[in-house]
Amino acid sequence: MIENVRSLAFDTIQDILNEGAYSNLRINEVLSENELNAMDKALFTEIVYGTVKRKYTLDFYLKPFVKTKIKAWVRQLLWMSIYQYVYLDKVPNHAIINEAVEIAKERGGYHNGNVVNGILRTMMRSDLPDFNEIADPKKRMAIEYSMPKWIIDHWATHYGLEETETILQSFLETTSTTVRANLTRASLDDIIEKLQDEGYDVEKDHDLPYCLHIGGQPIIHSRSFKDGFVSIQDKSSMFVAHIMNVDRHDHVLDACSAPGGKACHIAEVLMPEGQVDASDIHDHKIDLINFNIKKL
């Protein structure tokens, strides 16, 4: 039986926020385990990433409408609902409310369903608070861009307020999926051809020769990913191996390695003479490292 998309999204959000799951990996796992059509996959992914990315902003919008103490999971459910209300124009308000109330009743009984119903209906009849009215510019940026204030303070000290805001704006921009081409398996052109044969749109990166920007269905379903020709990795993480300028005989220690993308990238550069030791303080994260190693 296929679960409701918003119920799946809520479970995934809780895994990420409460259990420390990696957002990209958990999303891909859920998409692999559930038969969703393309529209539902897109909605699920948007809700999860959006709620996690904007949780401070969403809590700012929620705060005026919460008059009594609510449970943490109810707050997170309301964040998810507010994200849809504020940022997703095509989702009807009644659908947002009805789905949230059903999830609340299922997880916590009728009382929690009534709480969620009352808060959302009151919010949708009211004006949302405006973070532009916050006098302190650093506090305003922390809420508007959903970033911990201590980071804002640190950046403002080093870069000034204007440059800090430019940096923050970049974090909310929509970015394409990036993958790292494993050039020990095939040439870049051959890997691009494999991806295109599977129906992906592929664009070479301007800075890193092994970084590819792709569009299409989730890459984890592709033969290129399963056979180790590409690995999911953010471009910023790829720069680590690039700027290290390692020698092929080097022995590198990655002491906080999970999920292992950077360690595997360095290993690809060092093959076959060099060595990488990848470790992590959390035993349960070692499986993630081993998963990536097996694809080398």
Regions found by a protein language model. Name each.
Residues 1-296:
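S-adenosylmethionine
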